[in-house]
């Protein structure tokens, strides 16, 4: 049975059925593997690449300021927990699994071959960290009546509604929680997802999933090379410097002076958009028109009329848009005015390719992800400026949602959402 919500998005009725299915699937707990064996030499993309690791504990979660890895997955879940105590059990369990998976170790051995194996085995006997990050975010729906958390909802968190060019599919929208899983290689990302699902059959049910990628050489540059999207343009050139701590406090992280609930400090608002590209149509569009639409040179990434990718466009000297069109993507997204300074955000997008659509068109596009300290000042303001841009003819947002990336786990005695659940 389906109903239409107030935003005009078809929503399937799920939770009650999924709760029953999840409970039936739970056969027993799977222990965390603590012991580390001497590591063998697994195959690597480059020397020691599989041994790269990001710290798990800290004020902020990894996977936000972390230089983009080559492989990525977005997975939204419905939470099946029945009460606040169950939700705490989920967050504690996710903390344990993330801590182990991101740091690596020996795969757990199955003591009885008559039982299911404790690990999928797809990474072999040693689970290398492989630069894995798993970023946990919560959606607007987690703050409904189920867990009594409504008074603690981040002030700017809201359900994603349609923009004029959207064609949203309810099956690809929203979620109680969202995992952004990134690593050097796709098998590590898949292993992490399967591990988490195996440990949470009565607590989580997958709502939607999308896998993304950037080129390996862009990933290996550790942020020095801008990834190229499937329209052939560099994606993320105008990002603020993620290594500038003072700037990140201003742009990305929720701080104490924002009058948000105290538990949100150190977290970040996350906007996710699944954007389908009309690549066949785009590939038949003249180069000059493509560059006019974006406002950049396709090969170098430089603003039109300039030489280098990171040159700052001078819109004041081009008030009529003769060089960079007034409706170009870069000019609308960031007009470079004093007023637009407050709408800066950190983009962390990935390409996707899924085969073909029902109409026989290539199903390719962008998994747009951005982080900001204020959702309304950041993504929502930028997207409103982009409404009606020339690029809309070639792109179609089909899903996604707005989420809040939780603050980091401080140490081994802490867990995700601890400050939220203790209120």
Swiss-Prot record:
Looking at the keywords, is Signal present? yes
Q: What are the subcellular locations of this protein?
A: Periplasm
Gene Ontology terms, MF aspect: ferrochelatase activity; heme binding; metal ion binding; peroxidase activity
Q: Which GO terms describe its cellular component?
A: cytosol; outer membrane-bounded periplasmic space; periplasmic space
Q: Which UniProt keywords apply?
A: Heme, Iron, Lyase, Metal-binding, Oxidoreductase, Periplasm, Peroxidase, Signal
| UniProt-listed InterPro entries | Dimeric_a/b-barrel, Dyp_perox_C, Dyp_perox_N, Dyp_peroxidase, EfeB/EfeN, TAT_signal
Q: Which cysteines are joined by disulfide bonds?
A: none
Q: Which example biological process does GO assign this protein?
A: iron import into cell
Query: Residues that bind heme b, according to the entry?
Result: 236-238, 329, 334-336, 347
- Description of post-translational modifications: Exported by the Tat system. The position of the signal peptide cleavage has been experimentally proven. Can also be exported by the Sec system.
Family annotation (Pfam families)? Dyp_perox_C, Dyp_perox_N
Where protoporphyrin IX binds, per the record, is at 236-238, 296
Query: What does the UniProt cofactor note say?
Result: Binds 1 heme b (iron(II)-protoporphyrin IX) group non-covalently per subunit.
Reaction(s) the record says it catalyses: heme b + 2 H(+) = protoporphyrin IX + Fe(2+)
Q: Mainly resides where?
A: periplasm
**Which Enzyme Commission number(s) are listed?**
4.98.1.1, 1.11.1.-
Membrane-crossing residue ranges in chain numbering? none
Query: What does the record say about induction?
Result: Repressed by Fur in the presence of iron. Repressed at high pH by the two-component regulatory system CpxA/CpxR.
Entry similarity comment: Belongs to the DyP-type peroxidase family. EfeB subfamily.
Q: Oligomeric state and partners?
A: Homodimer. Part of a ferrous iron transporter composed of EfeU, EfeO and EfeB. However, this EfeUOB tripartite iron transporter is defective in E.coli strain K12 due to a frameshift mutation in EfeU.
Function, as annotated, reads: Involved in the recovery of exogenous heme iron. Extracts iron from heme while preserving the protoporphyrin ring intact. Also displays peroxidase activity on guaiacol in vitro.
Name it: Deferrochelatase
The gene name on file is: efeB
């Amino acid at each position: 049975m389906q109903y239409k919500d107030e935003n005009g998005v078809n929503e399937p009725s799920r939770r009650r059925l999924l709760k029953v299915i999840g409970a039936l699937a739970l056969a027993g707990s799977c222990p965390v593997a603590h012991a580390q064996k001497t590591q063998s030499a697994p195959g690597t993309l480059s020397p020691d690449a599989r041994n790269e690791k990001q710290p798990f504990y800290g004020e902020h979660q990894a996977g936000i300021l972390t230089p983009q890895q080559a492989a990525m997955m977005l997975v939204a879940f419905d939470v099946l927990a029945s009460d606040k105590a169950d939700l705490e059990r989920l967050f504690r369990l996710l903390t344990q699994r993330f801590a182990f998976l991101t740091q690596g170790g020996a795969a757990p051995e199955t003591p009885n071959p008559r039982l299911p194996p404790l690990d999928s085995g797809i990474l072999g006997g040693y689970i290398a960290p492989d630069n894995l990050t798993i970023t946990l975010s919560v959606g607007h729906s987690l703050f409904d009546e189920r867990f009594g958390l409504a008074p603690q909802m981040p002030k700017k968190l809201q359900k994603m509604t349609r923009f004029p060019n959207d064609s949203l599919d309810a099956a690809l929208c929203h979620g109680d929680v969202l995992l952004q899983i990134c690593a050097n290689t796709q098998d590590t990302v898949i292993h992490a997802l399967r591990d988490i699902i195996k440990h949470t059959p009565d607590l989580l049910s997958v709502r939607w999933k999308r896998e993304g990628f950037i080129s390996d050489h862009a990933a290996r540059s550790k942020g020095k090379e801008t990834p190229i999207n499937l329209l052939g343009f560099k994606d993320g050139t105008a990002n603020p410097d993620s290594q500038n701590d003072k700037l990140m406090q201003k742009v990305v992280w929720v701080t104490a002076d924002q009058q948000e609930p105290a538990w949100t400090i150190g977290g970040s608002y996350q906007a996710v958009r699944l954007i389908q590209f009309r690549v066949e149509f785009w590939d038949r569009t003249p180069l000059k028109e493509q560059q006019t639409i974006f406002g950049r040179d396709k090969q170098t990434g430089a603003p039109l009329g300039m030489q280098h990718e990171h040159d700052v466009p001078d819109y004041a000297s081009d008030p009529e848009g003769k060089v960079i069109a007034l409706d170009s993507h870069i000019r609308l997204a960031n007009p470079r005015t004093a007023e637009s300074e407050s709408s800066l955000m950190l983009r962390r997008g990935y390409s996707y390719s899924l085969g073909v659509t029902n109409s026989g068109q290539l199903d390719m596009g962008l998994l747009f992800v951005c982080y900001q300290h204020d959702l309304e000042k950041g993504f929502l303001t930028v997207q409103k400026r982009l409404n009606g841009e020339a690029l809309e003819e070639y792109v179609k947002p089909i899903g996604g949602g707005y989420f809040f990336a939780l603050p980091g786990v401080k140490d081994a005695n802490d867990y995700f959402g601890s400050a939220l659940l203790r209120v």
